[in-house]
Amino acid sequence: MRNVTLRQMRVFTAVARYGSFTRAARELHLSQPAVSQQIKLLEQEAGLPLFEHIGRTIHVTAAGQELLRYATQVTDLLREAGETLAAMRGLKRGVL
């Protein structure tokens, strides 16, 4: 999985969390077709389906569950890094 983007990870975790492409799109301020395209690209990169569509319901596949563990770690670490850097920007700097 050499060409996976952070955007794809965020989209993937949102779809898995909400069980809906439409709701994930709304949450991420993207169009539903943009979400579908990101998932399609991610599935192509993985070489496996990540979601199973049963009627109007979306379920995460076994491969999707495995990827979700890693994608959640990646997105959590990125959020934490952003929070740490934001806190550092708030520190006064100087020589004592």
Which role does the model predict for each range below?
Residues 13-30:
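Short helix-boundary/capping micro-motifs
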Residues 45-46, 50, 67-89:
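Alpha-helical linker/hinge and terminal dimerization helices associated
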Residues 56, 86-96:
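Interdomain hinge and pocket-entrance segments immediately C-terminal to HTH DNA-binding domains
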